[in-house]
Amino acid sequence: MTEEAGKFPFTRGVYPNMYKDKLWTMRQYAGFTSAEESNRRFHYLLEQGVSGLSVAFDLPTQIGYDSDHSMSEGEVGKVGVPISTIHDMDLLFKDIPVEKISTSMTINSTAATLLALYIISAEKKGISSKTLNGTIQNDILKEYIARGTYIYPPNASMRLVTDIFDFCSTHAPKWNTISISGYHIREAGSTA
């Protein structure tokens, strides 16, 4: 069997001409101390020519704590942007044409919540979830094996992962529903 780019089983790529016609998405991982600061950075990056955004979330957001929770003290905005509410998500993407760019969210345990906030924020602007393009990491096994930022038991967590697959297949078909990150597992001692 001769495999061709742009044709099933896509082992030679998903597009017939691959990057000859369309360059890969250029993006920089970013998330600052607040949604407003991060929004300013995103606007700057877009002005510099990036074709996508990559959101870094703070630790409380990664493990499901609101910024005002006592367990969040000292961690809010330290390693990324704090997102606790739809208002925060609205501020993060204020005046950004999310229907024209690709957004990557490096988030796992709270992936379903953050994706829902992103979609709701877009829909409030009149943008259909079916037009949104992006990726959510949604790699919960990495959290158990390497990072430790999981919330729920494994079965419940895996159910959330697959619920995202199911939801996006109908409501956000251009969305990449998982991005496996082997780096963390390798750094935690994997030999494969």
Residue ranges and their predicted role:
Residues M1-A192:
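Catalytic alpha/beta active-site cores
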